[in-house]
Each structure stands twice: as C-alpha cells, then as structure tokens.
Amino acid sequence: MIRLSQWIKACSLDQVKEGQLFGFHSDDKKILLANQKGKIFATDLICTHADADLSTGFLSDEGVRCPLHLSVFNLQDGKPQNLPAEIPLKTYNVKIEQDEIYVEV
Ligand code: FES
C-alpha cells in the first residue's frame, strides 16, 4: 500500500514558545514540536531507546534531552548525540501558516 504524506495541523504557534517542547497525537502518530531559538522542529515524541515522552525532557542548543536516560537528540536529523540511545528519531517537515503549525506526516 502506498501511503502519501499529508500535512496535519498541530497547534497554534503561540503554544510552542521559544525554548519550549510540545507533544501531540494525531491518529497513530505521536509527535514532538520544539522551538529552538525561534525555529520549530518536529520529531517523534517517544524516545528510540525506551518508552519515554520527550516532551517532558529538556531542550538546549544541542537538541532535546530524554528525561529517562538523558540521551540528547539533534532536532535537524534526529541523531542521538550520546548513549544509551543509538537509533535516530524520525524528523518531520514543518510549515507555519497564519500562526498555525503544520507537520508533514
Ligand atoms: S528512554 Fe530515552 S535515553 Fe533511555
């Protein structure tokens, strides 16, 4: 089955202020939004190492740090910067239209 990507509306821009994380669910997808220095990134919400919700983690210049075992994931390519996580997070395209954030899933 071919699954075409589609843009889904995530939330309004003012729900993800600079330095903040925001998690949401859409059908079977669990997505994390992060506002790093005014730019919005979208990745999977659940850590690739175990079942940790990254929206309860910590955002820094390096990326998002998992709250459970503290791996940091780069927001552009999803790659873990330190163990124990070894598998990259999936990343998603983001667009902003009329102060609403959309993610391509
Ligand atoms: S659950 Fe995220 S690093 Fe272990």
Could you tell me what each predicted segment is?
Residues 1-61, 74-75, 88-105:
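N-terminal pre-ligand scaffold of iron-sulfur
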Residues 47, 66-69:
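Short cysteine clusters
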Residues 61-67, 81-89:
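Short cysteine/histidine-rich metal-coordination sites, predominantly Zn2+-binding motifs
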